[in-house]
Amino acid sequence: MSINMRTLTQALAKTAAVIEKTVQTTVQEVTGPKPLQDYELLDQIGSGGPGLAWKLYSAKARDSTRPQQYPTVCVWVLDKRALSEARARAGLSKAAEDAFLDLIRADSGKLVRLRHPGVVHVVQALDENKNAMAMVTEPLFASVANALGNVENVDNVPKDLKSMEMSLLEVKHGLLQIAETLNFLHNNAHLIHRAVSPENVFITSAGSWKLAGFGFAISQAQDGNLDNLQSFHYSEYDVEDSILPLQPSLNYTAPELVRSKTSSAGVSSDIFSFGCLTYHLVARKPLFDCHNNVKMYMNTLNYLTNETFSSIPSDLVSDLQRMLSMNESYRPTALDFTGSSFFRSDTRLRALRFLDHMLERDNMQKSEFLKALSDMWKDFDSRVLRYKVLPPLCAELRNLVMQPVILPMVLTIAESQDKNDFELTTLPALVPVLSTATGDTLLLLIKRAELIINKTNAEHLVSHVLPLLLRAYNDNDVRIQEEVLKRSTSVAKQLDGQVVRQAILPRVHGLALKTTVAAVRVNALLCLAELVQTLDKLAVTEILQTIQRCTAVDRSAPTLMCTLAIANAILKQYGVEFTSEHVLPLIIPLLTAQQLNVQQFAKYILFVKDILRKIEEKRGVTVNDSGVPEVKPGCVADGLQFQTPTKKTEKVASAAKNSPAWDEDWALPTKISAPRDPGPANSPQFNNSTVQSQSSNRTSVPTTCPAVDLEWPPRQSFNATAQPANDETRINAAGTPTTPSFDELDPFANWPPRPNSASTASGGFHNSTTTQPPINNSGSGLRNNLTDGRQFQTTNNDFWAFGNASLSSMKSQQETSGIRASNADPLTSFGIQNQNQGMPSFGSSSYGNQKPQADISSIFSSSRTEQSAMKLAPPPSIAVGRGRGRGRSGTSISKPNGSKQQQTEQPSLLDLL
């Protein structure tokens, strides 16, 4: 049996077609119509069409590789299942549903064929399956019905739509565009729309008003053919048929279409509907609100009075009354309406009209218009600026001749936009300008760079703004270099640190070093000062190298002050140590620059002094005018912290008060300055116990760090000159009394005239500092007095056994230690002399001007030698043992006590000698 190949091929082709159709149907049932397959829905933006049955969604193409006419589009979706359920609830027949769907199909078919700027542009034609219908158009904002507050069939009302308020200027501009579209339909397309209403007028994302909803449209050739003319049937009672509207809304329908027996339906029917729409938009309320009740409609129409038009502008009333006339012949044409004084007398509207057709004008006309617009645009509201003014200006930026004129206005208007708005509408138009700008255009963009920086994200900043700045760095125009340096910091704050170091910082260094213009160098140095806070130490070191090279050839005052600004920024960012090590070596030589005036030099010297002061505070050491260092209590000096051990001194003070022979107010200095009569035999035992108690206290009281011996001269030099002191030191280590130099520690050693007792007590307190922590830099020997004061009682009897040889050795020791002490602290003896000068009561006592005073002092040592030795101030007025060093407040208390004690003890001293 032979096989007919032709028949087999045909059979296979039919089978393949059936399979393909089945597959397509199955895919559509699963994924929906083709527009839903090709585009990804984003958000619902509104609703529109007959009965607001269409849901409008913003969408973008799923295949981003294919070129698209619009970045975003509007997808119209009609849910058949929801429509069928609503029809069943309303009790309507299936035939009514099918008739409505046929109306939708006719609308989309005519919309595809019509090409006009005033008609909604279809991107992808209608496609449907058994569950839904969908088509794709240019991006839309919403329908006019939504803008007027009717948001039926909108699940979530967008924020922009909810807060939308159309100004009269925007309404005028939109009505003028619809009038031009009707003129095109009537005179060019020869169509009668018959359903001009807010549901069928749409606002695009660019702000233009466009016409749709051609389901009821007929050609003018069908006007006189009653057989082909579709008749509308409106009831004489209220009917809500908005679910499946099979005729236009009665509120916007001409009376000749409402009558049951109509002779004709011409273009004047659209003018009547357009008049109703105009009234609604201007008066903010509909002219007819009859709920499809024809009787109410006719009553309202027959009794239109002047009161009805009270809310209409006077220059529109006459034209609007003609448009709403029941007599068709009285109604103006669409073209006539565009010539109304309502439109012609508004200068702002004329400016918007010029912008609509700006691409058709020559450069001379554009220049003249833009000059007038520069003073006029401030009167526009934000919506008009965003949707009416900015889009045509951005489109005109492609004209290189007009860029310097248009760009300032575009950037000024962009200031009123939020960040999202700017990135969606303005930035795409600016990107070509940013990549090609030169000369004055580049200068303008650099001056307004902060606006672009603040309204773009980091990705756009790196891809579009940063290349613009780099071209400005390399430009030879000094003005551009200055401006880009001023804007560098704001860009650097939003960029990654590595990008700043690799792209911006080297170019700023280059401008600072290579330029011959002082203004450019100053701005470059100021830029470096502002960038310090974002840089690491390595980059800051490079900045210091640039400063050194700049100041080597340019020591003008502006350059030097910019250098100081960088130094201050480094000090603030990295502190004193880094600044003193790296910045001060550069700053100090600049102090000798003659270009600095008085105020500028003062700022320089204050900067240096401030650093030195902070270093002193950190070390805890201050140096007075005489060069004497002073260590503050509780501060760190040479890595050690000082803390006054108050517990030990308080115990010594309590022990002193237990002795009946000591003065209760100020015991220790009094006992040291004058020898007392030989005490009872138990005095040595009392002092030994006191010393032992002090030794135990020293080991028990904790300190913050090991003690530092601050006594001067050092012990080894003293021991080398006085062997008895060495012997005494060894005894002190065993817990017995010692006899150190008195001149080094006695606060009253240099008071003139010096009594004999001052020299006799010169062996008391030297080596006690071997285990005692210091107090401060001005009274290091005071605690030695307090600690070893009790030892004097056990040593004064043995002291006289040394004889004249011992006194001679002590005298030489006193001279040596005094000279060394005066070299270490020349202010010490000066302070004691001031205190002595302020104490006349002691000098005028029984030793004041008496001859025996000179004889007594000659026994021990010369008063001149004693005056030259290092002296310490008397202890403070507080309790004994506080260890607060030299203080003048203590002298007022010591004066009467010391004077009184020496007066009472002078006879016993003379008897002893």
Swiss-Prot record:
Annotated Protein kinase domain residues: 39-343
Q: In which tissues is it expressed?
A: Expressed in roots, seedlings, leaves, stems, flowers, and, at low levels, in siliques.
Q: Where is this region: Disordered?
A: 651-791, 811-913
- Changes seen on gene knockout: The double mutant scyl2a scyl2b has short root hairs and small shoots.
Q: Spell out the Polar residues composition-biased ranges.
A: 682-703, 716-726, 756-791, 811-820, 830-868, 889-907
Localization recorded for this chain is: Golgi apparatus membrane; Golgi apparatus, trans-Golgi network membrane; Prevacuolar compartment membrane
One MF annotation (Gene Ontology) recorded for this entry: ATP binding
Q: What ranges cover the HEAT repeats?
A: 311-346, 347-382, 383-401, 402-439, 465-502, 499-537, 578-617
CDD domains the UniProt entry points to: PK_SCY1_like
Q: Which GO terms describe its cellular component?
A: Golgi membrane; late endosome membrane; trans-Golgi network membrane
Q: Which Pfam family name is an example for this entry?
A: Pkinase
- Which key words tag this protein in UniProt? Golgi apparatus, Membrane, Repeat
Q: Where is the signal peptide?
A: none
Family matches, as PROSITE patterns: PROTEIN_KINASE_DOM
Task: Name the family the entry cites.
Answer: Belongs to the protein kinase superfamily.
Regarding domains, what does the record say?
The protein kinase domain is predicted to be catalytically inactive.
Sum up the protein's function in the record's words: Probably inactive kinase. Component of the AP2-containing clathrin coat that regulates clathrin-dependent trafficking at plasma membrane, TGN and endosomal system. Together with SCYL2B, required for cell growth, plant growth and development.
Q: What is this protein called?
A: SCY1-like protein 2 A
Gene (name only): SCYL2A
